[in-house]
């Protein structure tokens, strides 16, 4: 019953008109009246922000704020993989033979997420992370490794909540939501960075130019809280034993080790 009521509410409120209205409001000067309250409610760390709160004129500007230089140091070990976002690690684990990952006890198909069995095949028996960004988090996305962008594509249209309730009761949001997928190679292995849109707001903006990525370098931003899924090819990654789910993590902090370092 709870699942049915949750889905009914989401379907009744999640349509193109409400999405456009919310996006328009967030970009309007009127939304600026809510900035102070928003910062207090979500406990935004103003000491880290590039600008003072009074310099943000709309909620949209606050959502996509940049941070001061140096407040997110990137793990210096050249063999490490770092978090691309400030987030909560909601889940992590091994991708099964049938292309499924288990998130909050619920199976999700990476073939659906990536758009085909062919695209998913390299990640079978690999590793995954689910990184959830709440409205309070810094919304910019950075590269978790240094490598080369091999392919980039978008899937999905609508977006549903990707918070804990969404993962538990929703209609498979990690597979169905609007998502922008970036596939990166390094040392002959690949990593998929799946940026998933949040309810109402599908906007995922790319900021990186060129094919070469440097670990810790900005590559995109969300216009609202959302989720990043990392998919590692089999044999390419070893998680840091200190990492557990759920736990908070910040941009540049170590998630684990790329294959070449682990093999040594």
Curated annotation (Swiss-Prot):
Belongs to the phosphatidylserine decarboxylase family. PSD-B subfamily. Prokaryotic type I sub-subfamily. Binds 1 pyruvoyl group covalently per subunit. The keyword Cytoplasm does not apply. It catalyses: a 1,2-diacyl-sn-glycero-3-phospho-L-serine + H(+) = a 1,2-diacyl-sn-glycero-3-phosphoethanolamine + CO2. The active site is at residues 86, 142, 226. Pathway: Phospholipid metabolism; phosphatidylethanolamine biosynthesis; phosphatidylethanolamine from CDP-diacylglycerol: step 2/2. It is a peripheral membrane protein. It is found in: Cell membrane. Heterodimer of a large membrane-associated beta subunit and a small pyruvoyl-containing alpha subunit. HAMAP family: PS_decarb_PSD_B_type1. Catalyzes the formation of phosphatidylethanolamine (PtdEtn) from phosphatidylserine (PtdSer). One of its GO terms (molecular function) is phosphatidylserine decarboxylase activity. It is an enzyme of class 4 (lyase). Coiled coil: none annotated. One of its GO terms (biological process) is phosphatidylethanolamine biosynthetic process. Its cofactor is pyruvate. Its EC number is 4.1.1.65. Signal peptide: none annotated. It comes from Geobacillus kaustophilus (strain HTA426). This is Phosphatidylserine decarboxylase proenzyme. It comes from the Bacteria. InterPro entries: PS_Dcarbxylase, PSD-B, PSD_type1_pro. Keywords: Cell membrane, Decarboxylase, Lipid biosynthesis, Lipid metabolism, Lyase, Membrane, Phospholipid biosynthesis, Phospholipid metabolism, Pyruvate, Zymogen. Is synthesized initially as an inactive proenzyme. Formation of the active enzyme involves a self-maturation process in which the active site pyruvoyl group is generated from an internal serine residue via an autocatalytic post-translational modification. Two non-identical subunits are generated from the proenzyme in this reaction, and the pyruvate is formed at the N-terminus of the alpha chain, which is derived from the carboxyl end of the proenzyme.
